[in-house]
Amino acid sequence: MYSFIECIAGALFVLGCVVVTLVVIGVRALLYNFRNRPAPPLSSQLGQNAPHVTIIRPVKGLEPRLYDCIAASFRQDYPQDKVSIRLCLEDDTDPAYPVLQKVIEDFPTIDARIMLEKEDHVLSETVNMGPNPKIRNLSRAYREAKGDIVWIIDCNIWMAKGVLGRMVDKLMGYRVGGAAKPYKFVHQLPIVVDLMDFSTSLAAEGRSLLDASPEEDHPTEDLGAEEFPKVMSHGGGRIDEMFMTTSHAKFYSAINTLRAAPCAVGKSNMFRKSQLDQATDAILNPKLDQSKNLPTGVDYFSHNICEDHLIGEALWTTDFPGYKSHGLVWGDIAVQPVSGMSVQAYTARRSRWLRARKYTVLSATILEPFTECFLFATYMSLAMTTIPVLSQNLGIPKTWNATAIAWFTITTLWMLIDYIGYLRLHSGVTMEVDEHTPYFAKGFKNTGGIKRRPFLEFLAAWIGREGLAFPVWAYAVVFGNTVNWRGRLFYIHWDTTVDAVEPREERTREVRTPELERGPSRNKHRVD
C-alpha cells in the first residue's frame, strides 16, 4: 500500500512525463520546421487570380523600428493590385502618425490608407459596441475590407517578403502538385529580438525610428561602471526575448503540432472575413446566445480581453465543412524588435498577459508553472527520489543528495535544450534576406545580422527568465483582476468581458501594474 506522499509523487511524475512529451514534440517541431528557407509562395505567381488581401495594422505609439515593421507590409511579394493596407490609429495626435505618413509617401503605388478611430462615425452608432481599444481601433478597416481575406498584424511585427503569399497558400490550400485542404485560420510563430547590446551603450535607442537602418544602428559606447543599473533598466527586452524563443516557442509549437486546442498569440493572424462574420452571427451560429445582441465580425469581441485568442477560438469551434481549423505557417517567423525595456516593464507585461489568460484559458494558466524549468525540476526530482518502483528498479536512492543531483541534472538538460532551440530561431537560416531586410531580422548566420549572443549572456538571461517565472505568475494570477491596456485600466470579469475603470474608481481596485499605466513611449513601457 502506497503512502499519501508516494501517491502525490506518482501523480507529479505522470504530470512531468506529460510535460516532457510536450517539450519533445515542440523542440522536434522547431528543429524540423525551421531548418531551411521556405519555398517561394504559389499565390504570388497567380497574378489576377490571386485572392485579394486586406492587411490591417493597429498602431499605438512609437515602437522600435516602427518604419521597418510597417514597411514590411508594403514590400510583400504579392500582386500589388491584390493588396490593400490599412494603418489604424486612434487619432492624428499619436506620435506614430508621422511615421505612417512617411511609409505611405514612400510607397505611392500601393492601396494604403491611415484610418483614424475618431473619424469612424459608424463606430458610435454600432449597437452594443464594447470598450476593447484594439477592436475599436481596427473596426473600420475590418468593416470596409476589400475582398474576403484579412491579415491582422501588430504594428511592432516585421515579416519577410514571402510571408503574405505563404500564408495565403496555407489558408487557401495551394500547394505544389495539387490542392490541399484549406484552413479557417493561419498564423505565425512570433519571436522577440532585443536590440540592446550589453557590451555597448544605448546609442541605438536614441536614433530616429524613421531610419530604415541596418548595421549602423548598433550601439557603440561602453556601458562602463553603471552596467548593473542599466541591465535592470534595459534588460527586460533580453528576458522577453528569452521567454518568446524558449518556453513560449516550444510549447506553442507543440500545441499547434498536436492541434489539440486553439493556440494563437495574435501577432500575425489571417482568416476570412465571411467566416468570422458567420461565426459571430447569432442567427447563423446556433451556439451563440441571441439575447446578447452583439455586433458581428471583430466587433463581436469588443467587450472581451484576449480578442486574438477568442477570434481564433470562434473559428475553431464553428463548423465549416471542408476546412481545417488552425494552421501554423512553419518556417516563417514574426519578428518583434524591442529596445530599452526595463525588467520591471517585462514583469508588468507578462503579468498583464497572464492575468488576461486567466480569464480565457484558466486550466492552462493554472498548470503553466508546472511547465517552467525550476518548478518542473523540483517536483520531478522529488518524485524520482520518492516513488518506490524507481528506487527498486533503477536504484535511485531516497536521499536529499540524490534529489539535489537530479534537480541540477534536469535543469542543465532543460537549459541546453532551450539553448539549441534559441540558436535555431535566432540563426536566420529560414529568413528571406534581401536589401530591405533590417539587421535585427537577419539572424546571426547572415551577413550584417545581429550578433550571436555569448553563451554566458544567454545563461544569465535564461536564469533571470526562469527565476522570474513563478513570482510573476503568482502576482498576475493570484493578486488582481485589472489590467492596463493601451493606456486605460480595465476590470476583467470571469466571462472574459471587461469594463473600463473610470479614474476615480482606480484606487479601489485590488492590484495595479504601474509600469503598464504610463503613456506609450517606444518599447520601454510597451504593453500591447
From Swiss-Prot:
Residues that span the membrane, as ranges: 7-27, 370-390, 403-423, 458-478
Name of protein: Ceramide glucosyltransferase
Intervals of motif (Q/R)XXRW: 349-353
GO annotation, biological process: glucosylceramide biosynthetic process
Enzyme class, spelled out: transferase
Catalytic activity annotation: an N-acylsphing-4-enine + UDP-alpha-D-glucose = a beta-D-glucosyl-(1<->1')-N-acylsphing-4-enine + UDP + H(+)
Single annotated GO MF: ceramide glucosyltransferase activity
Family: Belongs to the glycosyltransferase 2 family.
Motif range (D1): 94
